[in-house]
Amino acid sequence: MSSDIQTADNKKSEVDPRHEKRIELLKLLFAFSFRPKQEPVEQLKKIVAQLSEIDQTISALAPERPLSEISKIDLAILRLIVFEWTSSKTPKKVLINEAIELAKEFGSDASPKFINGALSQLLEDNK
């Protein structure tokens, strides 16, 4: 039994630091969504500076759901991933996978499917 615990501990220590950074940014973006007039913390300044363009992209990906009807956590996940999509060299399929994992961890039961659908559309549009 102790080997099972050790295996679980080893898996916890193997968490990708990029995933941990995304979780931290996601939490900051989520909190920012409740106080958008407040000056963003340093880690969010680049994302907030592009928020208008990011939101336009999200609106185009999910035209049946106005931004105001997307849950704040789903919107934060989409904003984070769309920002990274345009500003990093991370493979697009990796970003979609990461978004789905974040949705499973922080969103509702419907979040992973919604986010997968929206971001898959982005992948299709950029082929």
Predicted regions and their residues:
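N-terminal interaction/assembly modules
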Residues: M1-P112, G117-K127
